[in-house]
Regions:
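Alpha-helical transmembrane segments and their membrane-interface boundaries
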Residues: 1-108, 121-258, 266-350
Length: 350
């Protein structure tokens, strides 16, 4: 029977190796939005301890096309009735987050959020751009699923590993509050993307990540966890960029990502003691991948990398501060509501 320490060490190595391999493959294959594939691979490696069967992988690709394609249905409404369209997007985000926290598939919920925000925002400006984003997401998912399968084949869980204990179910009232909070976190980035979807697409991905992280964050720790993980991700992206500048090639890109991934994976799986939840380290690594991926693309396009990074990091911080404010205000409102209605079911702070 393998020890818990051995299982965690194997999973940390698998997460770091898979994420690094997917990042290098995504840029090596010149995918249209290269940071999407490693983000999906990171999410799947952190969420699943078993590889997806072949049929399930194809089914997931079909689900991605259907769920992201749902954003295309909102484009005419956003064109002709923008206020109604925005409110409908907000309602759909609430329902999707509620579905994800009620026991639904977390990957499907993520794809639906992306479809409602990225696809509809891109299509509101240019329908062809929305189709390109869908194609990019499908390609990124296929690459991520392939890399995840290779990672599980190279580094499977030790024989005899016990399945994880199921998380306790939340009450319906608590799920609704958490879903409302997550939807309000995502909405400002969606409104920004309606202005210029090509420029604000990374902000949408960051806000989706924050929305998911906010469901496991309390008002007491919101600033430390949400803002702290964003700042740590930005700092790691800067260190990664200068380290990569020493030897600029795809092989070193993979090795540096492997090193950074191992450092954070040790924290994520509790191999190195710390005071932060796994979501903090996962959000930090996701933020680093988004910022780093955009910087590499800016450099390849001949843009001013440092100015673009400063602007993007500033927007990330603003979005994170807004998320912290939403967590704090909604938690305070919920506490006042429970205090004024003592017969209502009490719930711990979100």
């Amino acid at each position: 029977m393998p020890t818990e320490q051995q299982v965690r060490a194997r999973r940390a190595l698998r997460l770091a190796t898979g994420t690094a391999l997917c990042l290098a493959a995504s840029f090596g294959l010149a995918l249209p939005i290269p940071f999407i594939a490693p983000m999906l691979a990171l999410t799947m490696l952190a969420a699943m301890n078993r590889p997806l069967p072949f049929k399930a992988s194809l089914g997931l690709a079909v689900v991605l096309m259907v769920t992201t394609g749902s954003g295309l249905l909102l484009i005419p409404l956003l064109h002709h009735y923008p206020a109604t369209g925005v409110m409908l997007v907000g309602l759909c985000l609430f329902l999707v987050f509620r579905y994800g926290m009620s026991g639904g598939n977390s990957l499907v919920a993520t794809f639906m959020v992306v479809g409602l925000t990225m696809i509809s925002a891109a299509g509101a400006t240019d329908f062809d751009l929305a189709l390109q984003v869908i194609v990019s997401l499908v390609k990124g998912l296929l690459l991520a699923v392939t890399v995840v399968s290779i990672s599980h084949w190279l580094l499977p869980d030790p024989i005899g590993t016990q399945p994880p204990t199921p998380t306790p179910a939340l009450s319906a009232d608590e799920i609704s509050w958490l879903a409302l909070r997550a939807a309000l976190v995502v909405m400002p980035a969606f409104l920004l993307a309606l202005i210029d979807p090509a420029s604000y697409m990374p902000i949408i991905m960051k806000s989706v990540n924050l929305g998911q992280q906010s469901t496991a964050t309390s008002a007491r720790t919101a600033g430390r966890e949400l803002l702290g993980s964003t700042l740590l991700g930005g700092l790691m992206a800067i260190l990664f960029w200068f380290a990569l500048g020493l030897f600029v090639n795809l092989w070193m890109f993979f090795l540096w990502m492997l090193l950074f991934g191992l450092v954070l994976a040790r924290k994520l799986y509790g191999l190195s003691p710390g005071n932060y939840k796994p979501g903090f380290w996962l959000n930090s690594l996701t933020t680093m991948i988004i910022l780093l991926g955009q910087s590499v693309q800016d450099s390849a396009a001949g843009k001013d990398v440092y100015t673009a990074f400063a602007i993007r990091m500033g927007l990330f911080i603003l979005v994170t501060l807004y998320a912290c404010a939403m967590v704090y205000l909604l938690d305070k409102r919920r506490q006042r509501r429970n205090a004024s209605n003592p017969t209502a079911e009490e719930g711990h702070p979100c």
